[in-house]
Amino acid sequence: MAREIALDHVRNIGIMAHIDAGKTTVTERILYYTGRSHKIGEVHEGAATMDWMEQEQERGITITSAATTCFWKEHRINIIDTPGHVDFTIEVERSLRVLDGAVAVFCGVAGVQPQSETVWRQADRYGVPRLAFVNKMDRMGADFNKAVQTMKDRLKARAIPAQYPIGAEEDLRGMVDLITRKAYIFNDESLGAEFEVLDCPEDIEAEVEEAREALLEAALEQDDTLMEKYLEGEEITIAEFKSCMRRAVISSAFVPVFCGSAFKNKGVQLLLDAVVDYFPSPSDTPYIEGLLPDSEEAAVRKPSDEEPFAALAFKIMTDPFVGTLTFVRVYSGVMESGTSVLNASKDRKERIGRLMLMHANKREDIKEVRAGDICAVVGLKNTTTGETLCDPNKPIILEKMDFPAPVIAIAVEPKTKADQERMGVALQRLAQEDPSFRVEVDHETNQTIISGMGELHLEIIVDRMMREFKVDANVGQPQVAYRETITQMVEHESKFVRQSGGRGQFGHVWLRLEPNEPGAGYEFVDGIKGGVVPKEYIPAVKNGVGEAMANGVYVGFPMVDVKVTLFDGSYHEVDSSEMAFKIAGSMGLKEGAMKAKPVLLEPIMDVEVETPEDYMGDVMGDMNSRRGQIQGMEDSGNNRLVKAQVPLSGMFGYATDLRSMSQGRATFTMQFGHYAQVPKSIAEEIKAKTTG
């Protein structure tokens, strides 16, 4: 079967933005104008086509990046809708990995908002070419030039207008295309589907010419010959101008800025034209790099149907009708339904079931996908996010995505026995869909602990458990894994004797307990000389000591970093047994440890906060109130990086507090550093709470 659309007519794009910049509305309008959606869905009515999970429709925020295919001017555009909330940056990471270009949507009133900075940094990391769209130009206080300036100041982006707005706020009528100098005036009656193309209005001609010169000079940096032609006073044609613009966008030399109001249906068609004109097609990337699974040598695949098949799974979703959907981006070759491919990341074969093109939550079955396509596959059993599917005879592993470690954990308990069984299945499914969400069972408390990227993230997980899997669960407070240790050396004698007629019990040991190096754990040393305790009983002593340590002596938390030496003792020919020595060892540890000045230890986290200078004082003051110790500060771009060590117990609710403290502009990472002694007054409080 021949290719339906030439590879150079394919565009894989994402739409990224801050939470309220109007990203979903922009996507909706694109679907409307490209004929994919017959009725425009408004987000604030809870009806947008892309926001198709129930939680999204209620909250009016986009959580899951749905992939949609549409057509514009004989080009196929695959759109990945990305979430704009800090807790969902994992989704943004995933979608950026498989895009060839991204439209960054900004609010005409607020300009660059906090999450835009985070997403922009992620796009920089993956080297994604960008266009910017300043939306909401019809709103009170909208200012195109100010919005462009915030992109320069906050994102350090080389943002250059490619359009000039005609009118502002409620008088916004359209915009001038700086390349052609034509004015586009939109007709409100036809929902903006019809517009007039006129000459540039005279009252803004001077501003338009000045802006056009700036754009032209930046574009011509891509071509020395054309630059010379321009400097010699010759006219640059529109085709030459556009070709330089395209090269500039693909090489990320600068970011052209467009404007409009998606809600008022102005400017979206011109944005689509820009996507087609300036963004790269898959064939503009010379090749994609990967590794050979056996030798880890570098290997490449060119974006061509003739190359061996290679694709990356970038998202997994559970669909109520067809089961698991795996979204893949095909980089090379052809994949047909009904064939077998290799999951090179796991070295397992996978059978390809149905292949589908997705339109938000409507779908179309297809027989095959080719290089450059994005589609959903039904029925993959072993493939998770970030893994490579490829030709079994030509294996390759494409780059693996890095996912951040979760920063918050809570315990969940099913309300009934029936919920218990369903909860296991639900959590396993959700963890498979989302690599930034982890599930583990705490062996000490037997609780199921779920951890993720923030409180909203876990709220939505619990919400989905209820809606999709009908699991009712109680959600606990976040818990800290405390530990105990000793602070001085002690020698202690322990004797376990039971004589009650017949065979008795006899075990007698001398133990030396010493504090061990932090992090060294429990160490047992056999120091018996001359067989005073027979060899066969020594493992029993070790087990008894180990069990007592697991249960703790001071508050009841497991003990760590203790060195225990068995150095003396005695036995009875008849009455001694493994059980007697195990009990003697256990008693010896408990009694000895209480004399060795036991203390409580708590996990100390290494925390890094990246914050704009304005919030530095608040962040530092807040750190101190959490018993944090500032380790150092450094510059990070136009932000400041604060490094601190903070007890985990002080970090609960931090994501939410930091967000409100910095209006969402500060970000933080946190990972386990080491255990340290809890101050005595706090240890006593914990003891009182725990032992009741």
From Swiss-Prot:
Keyword Cytoplasm part of the UniProt annotation: yes
GO terms, molecular function: GTP binding; GTPase activity; translation elongation factor activity
Organism superkingdom: Bacteria
BP GO terms, sorted: ribosome disassembly
Signal sequence, renumbered to the chain: none
Keyword vocabulary terms for this entry: Cytoplasm, Elongation factor, GTP-binding, Nucleotide-binding, Protein biosynthesis
PROSITE patterns tied to this protein: G_TR_1, G_TR_2
Ranges for domain tr-type G: 8-283
Recorded GO CC terms: cytoplasm
InterPro entries for this protein: EF-G-like_DII, EFG_II, EFG_III, EFG_III/V, EFG_IV, EFG_V, EFG_V-like, G_TR_CS
Disulfide bonds: none
Binding positions for GTP per the UniProt entry: 17-24, 81-85, 135-138
Keyword rRNA-binding on entry: no
Locations listed in the record: Cytoplasm
HAMAP family: EF_G_EF_2_B
Protein family per UniProt: Belongs to the TRAFAC class translation factor GTPase superfamily. Classic translation factor GTPase family. EF-G/EF-2 subfamily.
Task of the protein: Catalyzes the GTP-dependent ribosomal translocation step during translation elongation. During this step, the ribosome changes from the pre-translocational (PRE) to the post-translocational (POST) state as the newly formed A-site-bound peptidyl-tRNA and P-site-bound deacylated tRNA move to the P and E sites, respectively. Catalyzes the coordinated movement of the two tRNA molecules, the mRNA and conformational changes in the ribosome.
Record's protein name: Elongation factor G
